[in-house]
């Protein structure tokens, strides 16, 4: 695609992003960070941009920042709950389905910059893509304005869903499977990435679950995390049937 087309898309994004942040009641300093946070690898590939200009590094950072923020929230809100309960609650809040709820609620899914092919194949509604962009946005917000502003954002966008019990139907199969295995004294659970295929903008990951030294189930997904969730779901359902 042409430089002019890229410029038009970027300018349109920046205007929409500015409007969105105003609606949410937040300011920002470095628009480039947020543009990167919403740049999917397919968009970068379409315009032959630097491969590190997509949002995966910010997603990595945002994942850690989000876990810290939610951990602090749960630690303060539930002073009498043991570590195990807090871990389970955190897993539910930061899992993919929950992040999709948060992103869609405020329209962040509409901000994602996608390549032409990804857009045509329904990438904008793909849960893993939306949750990744949400984590990348958190990473950008942290770098741009610090942890205090991330906390304020979470108070407005994340914590209300938790306090209104809107995440009760969300299932984090990795946590659910881990707890079941622990209850049954079946040993430790590990995950291995066994296959990664497809073009850079449309990867397909396959992961396996290892229990007691044996691979007991596999799962596929558009991200490594999604493939592990699907593998855990399969393993959990298998063991429940066996019992």
From Swiss-Prot:
Keyword terms? Cytoplasm, Endonuclease, Hydrolase, Magnesium, Metal-binding, mRNA processing, Nuclease, RNA-binding, rRNA processing, rRNA-binding, tRNA processing
Source domain of life:
Bacteria
The record's section on InterPro entries has: dsRBD_dom, RNase_III, RNase_III_dom, RNase_III_sf
Q: Any idea which residues are catalytic in this one? A: 63, 135
What residue stretches are annotated with the RNase III domain? 10-146
Q: Which residues fall in a compositionally biased region of kind Basic and acidic residues?
A: 219-231
| Primary localisation category | cytoplasm
- Which transformation does this protein catalyse, written as a reaction? Endonucleolytic cleavage to 5'-phosphomonoester
Q: Which cellular component terms (GO) are annotated to the entry?
A: cytosol
Class of the enzyme per the UniProt entry, highest EC level: hydrolase
Q: Which Gene3D superfamilies match?
A: 3.30.160.20, Ribonuclease III domain
Which terms in the Gene Ontology molecular function aspect does this entry carry?
double-stranded RNA binding; metal ion binding; ribonuclease III activity; rRNA binding
Query: What is this protein for, i.e. what is its function?
Result: Digests double-stranded RNA. Involved in the processing of primary rRNA transcript to yield the immediate precursors to the large and small rRNAs (23S and 16S). Processes some mRNAs, and tRNAs when they are encoded in the rRNA operon. Processes pre-crRNA and tracrRNA of type II CRISPR loci if present in the organism.
- Family under the similarity heading: Belongs to the ribonuclease III family.
Report the protein name in the record: Ribonuclease 3
Gene name of this polypeptide: rnc
């Amino acid at each position: 695609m042409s430089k002019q087309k890229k410029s038009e898309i970027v300018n349109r994004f920046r205007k929409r992003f500015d409007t969105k942040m105003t609606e949410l009641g937040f300011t920002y300093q470095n628009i480039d960070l947020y543009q990167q946070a919403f740049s999917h690898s397919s968009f970068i590939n379409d315009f032959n941009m630097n491969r590190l200009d997509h949002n995966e590094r910010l997603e990595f950072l945002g994942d850690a920042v989000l876990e810290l923020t939610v951990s602090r929230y749960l630690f303060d809100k539930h002073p009498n709950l043991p570590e195990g309960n807090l871990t389970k609650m955190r897993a539910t809040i930061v899992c993919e389905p929950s992040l999709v709820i948060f992103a869609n609620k405020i329209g962040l899914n509409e901000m994602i910059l996608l390549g032409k092919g990804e857009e045509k194949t329904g990438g904008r509604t793909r849960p893993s893509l939306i949750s990744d962009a949400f984590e990348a946005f958190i990473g950008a917000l942290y770098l741009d304005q610090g942890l205090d502003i991330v906390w304020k954002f979470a108070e407005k966008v994340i914590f209300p869903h938790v306090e209104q019990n809107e995440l009760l139907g969300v299932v984090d199969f990795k946590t659910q499977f881990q707890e079941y295995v622990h209850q049954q004294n079946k040993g430790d659970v590990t995950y291995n990435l066994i296959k990664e295929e497809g073009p850079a903008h449309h990867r397909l990951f396959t992961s396996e679950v290892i229990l007691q030294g044996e691979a007991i189930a596999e799962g596929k997904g558009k991200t490594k995390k999604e493939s592990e969730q699907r593998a855990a779901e399969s393993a959990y359902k298998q063991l429940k049937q066996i019992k």
